[in-house]
A protein has these predicted regions:
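Alpha/beta enzyme core
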Residues: 84, 98, 102, 122-123, ...
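Short, conserved beta-strand segments within well-ordered enzyme catalytic domains
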Residues: 50, 65-67, 76-80, 106-110, ...
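Alpha/beta catalytic cores of nucleotide-metabolism and tRNA/nucleoside-modifying enzymes
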Residues: 1-47, 291-390
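Glycine-rich active-site/cofactor-binding loop and its immediate structural neighborhood
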Residues: 73-115
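Short catalytic-loop micro-motif centered on adjacent basic/acidic residues
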Residues: 29, 107-109, 129-133, 251-253, ...
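Short beta->alpha linker loops
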Residues: 33-34, 111-115, 137, 257, ...
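An N-cap/entry alpha-helix motif that binds or orients negatively charged groups
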Residues: 1-71, 169, 176-234, 372-373, ...
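A gly/proline- and charged-residue-enriched helix-loop-helix capping module
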Residues: 102-123, 127-142
Length: 390
């Protein structure tokens, strides 16, 4: 396939996408919490590692495929769930699903998508889908969504566990971020219609609060800012409830950054975890996901799969994450940049760039199978500039 000479790297894709997004959308997708240090460190963590290639190996046939969620994925990465994709392009999540289908890559869908989970599932064909999930304080809303995902054929629900409260994103506050009136949170449109029939003018949403000792639940149309946070969740109650409710779908947790929580995830019989800090959008100063990965891999000890997201901007980053013990990677912002740049074709470009870079990295490293990637192919750059073997 011919190269897009305007865009040969993910960095160039970001620049091109920035030119096509309005300020509110650009800031919403790209901003991190507070000063944004975790967003930057998610990326810079990969620069701490150097590659140790092996030579004089036959790499004429390189197989980059892996099995994930019971299907063969063309590369060891998927498209991470990201909310409200019609902000970037009118086709939104449908463009993402079609691009994933064309490239043989698994897609995650946000609960707060601007396309229904059923329409995304149809557009995905035989490519597996996962549904990112929040457990709302009004559990009925979550239960409805889980049942719809089950009926539509989703392979797993992925519970976001790092949002007991919402991180502070200053540009969202300054821009007074809101979804444009022509768009809606599609998976909760029925609930929206209920409020539309009882209110004249704008439909209000309110977050939960306490009246004395009584907790008043979120009200109004379901939005991330009013309903996404849930400070009442606990290991003892939420995980058993979700496993029972979601069966036979798998239950994964996204937002684990410590070995202690990884061990609790194993103890509570979840099917897998995603090492994630919400793209640096929740708690600024959190461990970069790549820095957290080795501790979590050791704690899990191969009892369940360990995936990772955050900061990946090149195929070699994927190689490094796998070498440190990740089983699979998820790509977020670069896919949104592809969507903003050129819809489905832009996402396909993003996925092709990362896939080509990863396969080239495999070959130049002397590796022909993903399962052969290990720590022996990395060394770490120390603060004094010296390299140390892992």
């Amino acid at each position: 396939m011919a190269h897009d000479l305007n865009c040969l790297t993910i960095a160039e894709l970001e620049v091109l996408a920035t030119e096509r997004m309005d300020k509110q959308t650009r800031d919403y997708y790209n901003e991190g919490a507070d000063g944004g240090s975790t967003v930057r460190e998610n990326m810079s963590a990969y620069k701490k590692y150097r590659l140790r290639p092996r030579v004089l190996r036959n790499v004429s046939k390189v197989d980059s495929s892996v099995e994930v969620l019971g299907a063969r994925n063309s590369v060891p990465f998927g498209v991470a769930p990201a909310a409200m994709q019609k902000l970037a392009h009118p086709d939104g999540e449908l463009a993402t699903a079609r691009a994933c289908k064309s490239k043989g890559i698994v897609m995650g869908l946000s609960s707060f998508s601007t396309t229904t989970l059923e329409d995304v599932r149809t557009a995905s064909g035989n490519i597996p889908n996962i549904l990112q999930l929040y457990l709302f304080e009004n559990r009925q809303h979550s239960s409805k969504l889980i049942q719809r995902a089950k009926q539509a054929g989703y392979k797993a629900v992925v519970l976001t566990v790092d949002t007991p409260l919402l991180g502070r994103r200053n540009l969202e506050i300054r821009n007074q971020f809101h979804l444009p009136s022509h768009l809606k949170i599609a998976n909760f449109a029925d609930e929206d219609d209920i409020y539309a029939s009882t209110w004249a003018g704008p439909r209000p949403s309110s977050a939960a609060f306490y009246e004395g000792d009584h907790r008043v639940l979120p009200a109004g149309p379901i939005t991330f800012h009013s309903h996404g946070a849930n400070p009442t969740l606990s290991w003892e109650e939420a995980i058993p409830w979700l496993k029972q409710e979601a069966s036979p779908m798998q239950v994964w947790l996204k937002g684990i950054v410590t070995g202690e929580d990884a061990q609790l995830a194993v103890a509570h019989n979840v099917d897998g975890i995603i090492v994630s800090n919400h793209g640096g959008r929740q708690l600024d100063g959190t461990l970069a996901t790549l820095d957290a990965l080795p501790e979590i891999v050791a704690a899990v000890d191969r009892r369940i799969p360990v995936h990772i997201d955050g900061g990946i901007r090149h195929g070699a980053d994927i190689f490094k994450a796998l070498a440190l013990g990740a089983d699979f990677c998820w790509i977020g912002r670069p896919v949104l940049w592809g969507l903003a740049y050129d819809g489905q074709a832009g996402i396909e470009l993003c996925l092709r760039l990362l896939s080509d870079e990863f396969r080239l990295c495999m070959g130049l490293m002397g590796v022909t199978k993903v399962s052969d990637i290990s720590r022996e192919y990395l060394c770490r750059m120390k603060r004094d500039g010296l390299l140390s073997r892992l």
